[in-house]
Amino acid sequence: MLATEKKQEIIKAFKKHDSDTGSPEVQIAILTERITYLTEHFKVHKKDHHSRRGLLKLVGQRRRLLDYLKGKEVARYKAVIERLGIRR
């Protein structure tokens, strides 16, 4: 699970203005951190299939947010994927 302090760091790094907690960039960054955490979890717990389903839901949610951002503003989309390093 994502610690509150870590979540606050992510929000601070990706926010667009002072009270921003829900912009697509912030949401994508938080989802990416959770996906990374679960990926490491599965390296140890290979048979945790219930959590694997949750991981797939998170990946799908992030994909939808990225598609939304790409449709709205391509420059912001490219900036986010470059900062997070989620596309090759």
UniProtKB/Swiss-Prot annotation:
Keywords: Ribonucleoprotein, Ribosomal protein, RNA-binding, rRNA-binding. GO terms for biological process: translation. Part of the 30S ribosomal subunit. Forms a bridge to the 50S subunit in the 70S ribosome, contacting the 23S rRNA. HAMAP family: Ribosomal_uS15_B (MF_01343_B). This is Small ribosomal subunit protein uS15. One of the primary rRNA binding proteins, it binds directly to 16S rRNA where it helps nucleate assembly of the platform of the 30S subunit by binding and bridging several RNA helices of the 16S rRNA. Forms an intersubunit bridge (bridge B4) with the 23S rRNA of the 50S subunit in the ribosome. Belongs to the universal ribosomal protein uS15 family. Gene3D superfamilies: 6.10.250.3130, S15/NS1, RNA-binding. It comes from Pelobacter propionicus (strain DSM 2379 / NBRC 103807 / OttBd1). The gene is rpsO. One of its GO terms (cellular component) is cytosolic small ribosomal subunit. The keyword Ribosomal protein applies. NCBIfam families: S15_bact. It comes from the Bacteria. One of its GO terms (molecular function) is rRNA binding. Pfam families: Ribosomal_S15.
